[in-house]
């Protein structure tokens, strides 16, 4: 009986270790795929690429894109959250988020806002689009709360 119990403990320990290794491999594959997808889609040939994103400057303005990736074990999907800041000379700035399934290319969520000024020159976001799946949102905080299940599970 003692040998049986020791054998069961060993079996669970080995299978737990193997599961952790396979999850780690999936997370690494996700990170690599997200990085390739991000660079291809958001960082053109003229950009300066660093580990956290890419930067492009041209006569019209500046563009900075960053990203994070997450392997969601519950959904068995790899997600890329791209975040862009764009500033055009003499005009508004733009703030853009896109949540994308790396394997299928499906867009799960979008947040796009222009930065404007009110009559007292206070900065405010002018939200052009904010949606996660079929849910509409009204702020960046609401957007971040709605994407949390995709990026934290």
Q: Where are the predicted features?
A:
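N-terminal export/targeting and maturation segments
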Residues: 18-68
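Sequence contexts marking disulfide-bonded cysteines in secreted/extracellular proteins
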Residues: 29-33, 42-44, 53-55, 77-81, ...
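Low-complexity intrinsically disordered segments
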Residues: 109-153
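Sec-dependent N-terminal signal peptides
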Residues: 4-15
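Processing junctions and N-termini across compartments
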Residues: 24, 72-74, 124, 131
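Mature extracytoplasmic domains of secretory-pathway proteins
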Residues: 59-113
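Cys/His-rich zinc-coordinating "finger/knuckle" motifs
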Residues: 37, 50, 85, 137, ...
